[in-house]
């Protein structure tokens, strides 16, 4: 399951989505997330599905690789669906003892499941097609107006970049520790929830130690190179909007207009 997490990983490919400016992809991801919450009917989610499918095809990232990330939220998805079905009041369609499944609960469960899945896939496409350095530069440029309010934009962007960069590293470290623990007789799969939580303790302690050690090594390396942020720092590859970025913004605005129209019309 650890290997199935795709957020934070980068998949190299020669695609239109990979070539887009990181600012375009950041704004596009935010716009897609907003649209997921604007749509509230299955007709609306059909439009979101078409848009998302188009992005996946244009990204040239294997569908299997993208959907692999859904395995990590499968249990959360089941819990969300279950509690929405039995806790939402409305017309009862099925009953077993004190457990009642309502029609409204089924609709809400389906809606929440779709939203959760689309949020994960949408975020995964952005990180799979954008390197951490590109994300840092794009985020810093987008937040640059906040410099006038004395907000440390560069530091915020750098922290997010380091966090994204550490995700695959920590996942790899976790996988190594799990294999070492399993070789010593540890069992992470069997048992109830409490037993599984207890079995995770030998995994978490060395993982935290490794994370702090890596963070300390990175901090010392940055200090040794006299690293400092600021407005005077230059970029090896300055960000510039191109024609494909303008086309992407037009498509995004049209898509959001459809989402707002669906919401206003109650479709």
Task: Place the predicted regions along the sequence by residue.
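Loop-to-transmembrane-helix entry motif
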Residues: 69-77, 113, 117-120, 207, ...
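Alpha-helical transmembrane segments and their helix-start/interface "positive-inside/aromatic belt" motifs
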Residues: 25, 64-74, 248
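Transmembrane helix-loop junctions in multipass membrane proteins, especially transporters and channels
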Residues: 41, 45, 60-64, 88-96, ...
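Juxtamembrane/interface alpha-helical elements of multi-pass membrane proteins
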Residues: 73-186
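Transmembrane alpha-helix interface motif
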Residues: 1-42, 48-57, 141-144, 148-151, ...
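Alpha-helical transmembrane segments and their membrane-interface exit regions
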Residues: 51-61, 76-79
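Membrane-helix interfacial "entry" motifs
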Residues: 14, 37, 60-68, 96, ...
């Amino acid at each position: 399951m650890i290997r199935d997490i795709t957020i934070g990983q980068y998949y190299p490919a020669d695609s239109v989505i990979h070539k887009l400016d990181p600012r375009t992809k950041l704004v596009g991801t935010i716009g897609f997330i907003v649209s997921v919450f604007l749509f509230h009917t299955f007709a609306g989610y059909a439009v979101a599905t078409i848009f998302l499918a188009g992005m996946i095809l244009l990204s040239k990232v294997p569908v299997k690789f993208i959907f692999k990330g859904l395995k990590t939220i499968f249990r959360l998805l089941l819990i969300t669906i279950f509690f929405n079905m039995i806790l939402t009041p409305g017309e009862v369609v099925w009953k077993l003892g004190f457990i009642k499944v309502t029609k409204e609960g089924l609709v809400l469960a389906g809606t929440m499941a779709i939203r959760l899945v689309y949020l994960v896939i949408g975020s995964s496409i952005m990180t799979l097609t954008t390197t951490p350095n590109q994300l840092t530069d794009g985020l810093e440029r987008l937040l640059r107006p906040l410099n006038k309010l004395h907000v440390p934009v560069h530091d915020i962007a750098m922290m997010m970049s380091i966090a994204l960069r550490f995700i695959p590293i920590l996942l790899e470290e976790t996988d190594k520790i799990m294999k070492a623990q399993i070789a010593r007789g540890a069992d992470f799969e069997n048992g109830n929830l409490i037993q599984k939580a207890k079995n995770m303790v030998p995994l978490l302690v060395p993982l935290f130690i490794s994370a702090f050690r890596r963070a300390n090594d990175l901090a010392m390396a940055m200090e040794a190179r006299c690293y400092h942020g600021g407005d005077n720092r230059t970029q090896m590859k300055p960000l510039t909007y191109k024609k494909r970025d303008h086309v992407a913004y037009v498509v995004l605005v049209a898509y959001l207009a459809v989402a707002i129209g669906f919401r206003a019309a109650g479709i």
